[in-house]
Amino acid sequence: VCIVLVFASLSISVSPLNSALTQYDRHATSDLVEAVSGERIMQTIQDLQDFGSRAFYLDSSEEVASYILGHFQAMNIAAEYQEFMAGIHSVKNVVATIPGTSASAPHFLFGAHYDSENRYVRTASDGQMLPAPGADDDASGVACVVELACVLSNLRLQNTVRFVAFGAEENGYDSSGRMAGSRSYVESEKAKGTSYDACWILDMIGYGGGSENHTVVVVNEDSTGLGSDMQEMVGALGIELSIVVESNSSLLSSDHASFWSAGYPAALLIESDPTTGAYQFNPYYHSAEDTIDKLSEGQIVAVAQGLVATLMGISSPESSNEGGLVLISVTIAIGSASAVVVCIYYIKRKVKEK
């Protein structure tokens, strides 16, 4: 069931970030930031963990893809599968799209991988036997992407916004994964001539390690602005999130690498960088102990809020009514997994003078 009540429209066009805070009503952005729900995020993580293992070569992989697709569709966001092969395994990406008002405008993308892995797996049988709950790696990222879709589902930008859950990011027992899903997606986008202004990949964002709410934003020479943009908006809105921006083109172990290789501006958001020692690496990585009780809800919420603020920071209003109430009530039941999603937020903003 999905109920959407909209009492005002919202139309946004893209402008440079350095003028965003003077052009964009800070209160509207703050309202969207406050709409991010830790309860919804943690419920999605729990649901994904409850699948036991989400290895891309298991039957559960298709069940998880269906679960994620159902989330997007229940928000009235157009969503579809993109099928690809990882070795001998047929796997699916889940792609949701909020279309922009300008077909020629570059796209934005939020992505995370939904498969998980246990480091002790050597055969397909091992994969069936050994748990890989993957709460941090990477249910945390997927839950954040789903939450961003919920909060942004009634906004209209000139730019199209994509939300993608990638399959087969992990190696797999036969090493046929290795970011096969994101590579397939990027190859398809390049073939279609799709351009992107910003791609944010979220991978392991929930482990706090006893530190304050934080994230490491890994960029390369083509995407340095994505880190500074996020720092600026988080600071401007007082979001409690410490951000370390690292230009590290040698860190290629997640889906952002597929976008870098295609020349797309992309940033990896991750809780630590083991190559530089920035923050504590999750010691439960790729084990049966990577569970939801090890995660910081506040940190994941802050990351989601920072991304909402960043997206709004590179947008400016075209026109709008004085205010509006948006209510989304979503109930999803797919197989043994269920979730209740409720988005309520009030948007108040001024009409931009021409």
Language-model features, listed with the residues they occupy:
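Secretory targeting signatures
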Residues: 1-24, 317-354
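N-terminal hydrophobic or amphipathic helices/low-complexity stretches enriched
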Residues: 14-59, 98-99
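Extracytoplasmic/secreted proteins, especially bacterial periplasmic and envelope-associated proteins
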Residues: 28-31, 40-43, 47, 59-76, ...
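Loop/turn elements at helix/coil->beta-strand transitions in domains of secreted/extracellular proteins
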Residues: 41-44, 74-79, 104-108, 157-162, ...
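A non-catalytic alpha/beta surface segment that caps or lines the substrate-entry region
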Residues: 43-103, 242-243
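Solvent-exposed loop/turn segments at secondary-structure junctions
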Residues: 53-56, 78, 84-89, 100-103, ...
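Acidic/histidine-rich catalytic neighborhood of metal-dependent amide-processing enzymes
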Residues: 129-225, 229
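Active-site-adjacent substrate-binding region
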Residues: 198, 205-318
